[in-house]
Amino acid sequence: VRPEIVAIGAVRTPLGSFGGAFRDVPVWDLGAAAIAAALRRAGVAGGDVDDVIYANCRQAGNGPNPSRTAAVKGGIPVPVPTHTVNMACPSSMKAVMLGWQSLALGEARIVLAGGMESMSTMPFLLKNARWEGFKLGDRTLTDSWSDTIDPLVGYGMGMTAENLAEKYGIARDEQDRFAAESHAKAARAQDDGLLDAEIEPVRLPPTRSDPDGRVVARDESIRRETAAAKLAKLKPVFKKDGSVTAGNACSMGDGASAIVLTTREHASALGAKPLFSIVASAQTAVDPAVMGEGPAHAIPRALERAGMTLRDMDFIEVNEAFAVQILANERALGWDRSKVNVHGGAVALGHPTGMSGARILVTLDNVLRRHDGEHGVASICGGGGVTTAMIIRRER
C-alpha cells in the first residue's frame, strides 16, 4: 500500500519586482530564506531532512548545483544531498512531485522541495569571447534572457501567447479586463492580510542608510491603479498587430518557495500537524507553439488519476504567464472562474519562474484554509510545451 504523503511546512518569500527590493540578493539567499522558514514552520531540524529537491531555471552565473548552496545556507547539513531541477516554469512543482515519489517509494522520510529564481541578477553573456578574443572589431553582448527563446519554435513565450489568442479567438479587451481583475484581486488580498500566512518576510543585508537591514514583507508588483482602460493604451510587445502587452502578461521578479513533505505516519510520529495531503499529479507536453494550453491537458489527467472531476475542486490555481493563457484554458476546460486564482495571479504578483510551481501550491493551501475549501488543483505550463498539475486536499 502506497503511503499517504503530506506537507507539514509550506511557505514563500515575498515576490520582488524586477530590479526591486531583491535586485542585489543572490538567488541562493532567497532560496535559503524560504528553506529555513519552511523547516521552522514544520518544526523539523535540517538534519532530519533526507533529501532536498529544489528548482532554479535561470542558472547562468549561479554556480554548480545552485540549490545545494541554498540548502546549506538555509540550515540543511552538508551530508544531506541536494539536486537542482530545471523543467522551465513547472520546475518547482516537478520538484514537489519528485519528493512525493521518493517518499512513496520509501527512499526518504522527509523531503524538502520547492524552488527559487532571481531574474534581476540574470547576467549578460559575451559568447565565444574565450576563443575569438578581442584583437579587432566589435563583439555582441548577449542578454541571458535569450535563453527564454524556445529553440523548438524559434521564438519566445510572448509569441506562443499570441498564437493562443489567434487559436482561441481571444480579443485584446478580454485580456486587459482579466489582467486588471488579477491586480484588483491581489490588491484586495494584500490589503486584507489574506496573503500574510503564506509569506515569510526577508531581511535584506545591512546598508549604510539602513544598518539593521530592511525587511521585505509584501509582494512588490501589484498595481492598485490598474484598470482595463489604462491597459488598453499599451502597445503590443511581441507582434505588430498583436494583443499581448506588458500589462496583460506576467511581470518578471525574484523569490523562492519551499515545502516540507513526509508520510502521514512519520508526521504523526513527529507530532507535526499536516497542512495538506497530495491526492494526485500529472505531467504532459503539448505543441511548444501553444505551450500555454498545457493545463487543459494536465489537469484532466490528474483528475482522472484521482477519480475526481473539475467540479470537485473547490479552488483552482493556474499560473498566469499571460492573461490570454488563462482565458484559453478556461475555454478548453469550462471552469468556474470564481474559483480560479481568487487572490490574484502572476499577472499581478509576478512570475519568478523557478519558484512559481511550488508557489501556487503554497497559495492554494492558503486559499483552501482562508475560504474553507477541501480540494484544489494547481497547474503551471512552461517553455517547450511542458506542464504539471497537482491535486491537494486540505487537512483539518
What are these regions (language model features)?
Residues 56-110, 151-157, 225-251, 332-360, ...:
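Conserved catalytic cysteine-centered active-site region
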Residues 1-25, 227-293, 297, 304, ...:
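Condensing-enzyme catalytic core mediating Claisen C-C bond formation in acyl metabolism
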Residues 2, 100, 110-163:
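Flexible glycine-/small-residue-enriched beta->alpha junction loops
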Residues 87-117, 165-194, 258-265, 330-331, ...:
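Active-site-proximal alpha-helical scaffold in enzymes
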Residues 1-62, 66-74, 78-81, 160-172, ...:
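Conserved active-site "lid/cap" helical segment
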Residues 54, 159-162, 198, 208, ...:
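Active-site pocket-lining segment
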Residues 12-13, 23-24, 28, 32, ...:
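N-terminal extracellular/periplasmic Venus flytrap/periplasmic-binding protein-like
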